[in-house]
Design a protein with these regions (language model features):
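Thiamine diphosphate
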Residues: 1-157
Length: 157
């Protein structure tokens, strides 16, 4: 199974038509697949909180948005998540590469990994962690849940 294609197929099947991304080596294949799809308008962001603002605008314009980002920027997005996305009950699937776990080659990534899940839990953001390739089978139902309950949802990869 091509995971990048499966993720993108699930986005399209759930009418996600706007995706913003921050450069990410771990999710580069997904980003490339999204860029190749005519059904998805892809706009790169400079920063994660900027991307969330773009997603909010897309949502207000009638689109179903998603963001692809790194967990190391969760701290930067707290205010935007709380004061914009959560306050206005905007559904936002957040596909987040989870840096800083075992075998992480960059030491500074480890510090944010220690806080990522706790910050998401403190904000009452439903969080799912894909540990194996088979976990991607859950992505479709997670997207459905996100749009049904009008909440941001974190999917850690």
């Amino acid at each position: 199974m091509n995971i990048d294609k499966k993720i993108t197929d699930d986005l399209v099947a759930n009418d996600v038509s706007f995706v913003t991304t921050v450069p990410c080596k771990q999710l580069a294949g997904v980003i490339d697949e999204i860029e190749a799809r005519d059904e998805i308008f892809h706009i790169p962001s400079n920063k994660e909180d900027e991307g969330m603002g773009l997603c909010a605008g897309a949502h207000m314009g009638g689109k179903r948005p998603a963001i692809i980002m790194q967990n190391t920027a969760i701290g930067v997005t707290i205010n935007t998540l709380a004061a914009l996305i959560q306050y206005y009950r905007m559904p936002l699937p957040m596909l987040i590469s989870y840096r800083g776990e075992l075998r992480e080659p960059v030491a500074c990534q480890v510090e944010m990994a220690v806080h990522t899940k706790a910050l998401l839990a403190q904000m009452n953001i439903p969080t799912y962690h894909f540990h194996t390739q088979a976990d991607v089978a859950e992505f479709d139902i997670i997207l459905k849940y996100t749009f049904m309950c009008n909440k941001p949802v974190a999917i850690l990869t």
